[in-house]
């Protein structure tokens, strides 16, 4: 467990889990949102993002937090461990709302309200994204440890079980 990706619906607890995993393992943590977004709410080019992601994937160890479906298959091919947060919609919406007004490491600004487009992304994640994620997990399962969390309690239990 040295090349880890943490994926799942926004608001599901991915980042909190990734930070706890980093603290427990000492592995470097990379936030895809922090790579993609600039402080002015614009983003870097796809080429620059791809270059930075390739540099991370070439490392001996990492934890990568985030979805970015365009590059998910590349990350799945490179990693040895996947943590998927497949939590109920209500939990994810509550998670996204609970972080409003708070500074975060993964985005360079503070949201004070839930953006309607972001809310739609969360609401559509189960129908739009999860089927493809599960398909890619089946395709790239060989030689990988895949852990699927259905609750934050399961994720916390996993962290507590690490030595």
Predicted regions and their residues:
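ATP-binding Walker
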Residues: 12
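Hydrophobic anchor at the beta1->P-loop junction of P-loop NTPases
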Residues: 6
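NTP-dependent small-molecule kinase module
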Residues: 24, 124-163
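A glycine- and Lys/Arg-enriched "phosphate-lid" helix/loop adjacent to the NTP-binding pocket
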Residues: 87-132
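Conserved nucleotide-sensing/catalytic segment adjacent to the nucleotide-binding pocket
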Residues: 28-82
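Walker A/P-loop
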Residues: 15
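P-loop (Walker A) phosphate-binding loop of NTP-binding proteins
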Residues: 9
